[in-house]
A protein has these predicted regions:
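Phosphate-binding site of ATP-dependent enzymes
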Residues: 9, 132-133, 140-144, 151-239
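Anionic group-transfer/hydrolysis microenvironments
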Residues: 29, 76, 104, 150, ...
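Short catalytic-loop micro-motif centered on adjacent basic/acidic residues
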Residues: 101, 125, 146, 184-186
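N-terminal cationic-hydrophobic initiation segments that often serve targeting/anchoring roles
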Residues: 17, 94, 139, 175-176
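Short acidic, glycine-rich loop/turn motifs
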Residues: 49, 149-151
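Conserved N-proximal alpha/beta basic substrate-recognition cap immediately N-terminal to
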Residues: 3-128, 134
């Protein structure tokens, strides 16, 4: 499921191969525990910058995860119980000395949307709730808001609700599944027309360029998967 035109996983595969690493590919269903040992069924592969045929599987094996030097956890959301179980399996390999990127405990602790609550001074006004009345009050206060699920990706199920929109109720019911799931609401920031920014941090240091994702064609969403245009930009002082 890797899109080599935009997915950073492909760039990582190319660079790891260039540095002489043997590449192993595995999915969630390939991970398992046996008597406390983390193992996986893996495919070795080679990659190349070729849109028609960018990978070739070269072998298949079943091995302890502790035999691998580095594991890059690249699973996309949803952040569900299966995702959490996978981090526990990876943690067993981490205890044996394998470098897991990112750290399994951090993947569990730092939900990419909810974790913003730990630095709310840098975010729009944000409400996380499953209560429809609270969502309505937040909308009435701001008049123009963004509503989204906590476990989505790629711009899926993100709604902009303007003042007077008659769909607020059904959007709230859909996102919260009639009050049984949390969702997030934020006041709309017009600056999104200039793009949002993805800043990468490696070992605590920001990469000097960020990815700006710019909405296209009247869209609110800048996600590349939703048609946004990607643009590399140098970091500013405020970034």
């Amino acid at each position: 499921n890797i899109n080599i035109k935009k997915d950073s996983s492909f760039a990582m595969l190319l660079e790891a191969q260039r540095r002489g690493y043997e590449l192993h590919y595995m999915e969630m269903a390939d991970l398992y525990l046996i008597n406390g040992e983390a193992r996986a069924r893996t495919h070795t592969l080679s990659v190349e910058q070729n849109y028609d045929k960018w990978y070739d599987f070269t072998g298949e094996q079943d091995l302890p995860l502790a035999d691998l030097d580095v594991i890059l956890m690249r699973k996309d959301p949803p952040f569900d119980t299966e995702f959490i179980y996978a981090t526990y399996i990876l943690e067993r390999a981490e205890e044996k000395g394998t470098l897991i990127v990112n750290k399994p405990q951090s993947l569990r602790d730092c939900n990419e949307k909810l974790f913003t609550a730990w630095f709310s001074e840098l975010t729009p006004e944000t409400l996380v709730t499953r209560n429809k009345a609270q969502l309505k009050a937040f909308w009435e206060k701001h008049g123009d808001i963004i509503m989204k699920p906590l476990d989505g990706m790629g711009g899926a199920s993100i709604f902009r609700v303007k003042a007077g929109d008659p769909n607020l109720g059904v959007i709230a019911e859909t996102l919260t599944e009639l009050g049984s799931r949390y969702c997030m609401a934020q006041n709309y920031l017009p600056a999104i027309k200039d793009g949002d920014k993805r800043v990468l941090v490696v070992d605590g240091e920001p990469v000097p360029y960020c990815l700006a994702r710019i909405p296209q064609g009247g869209e609110t969403r800048g996600n590349l998967a939703a048609g946004g245009r990607g643009e590399a930009r140098p970091l500013t002082e405020s970034d």
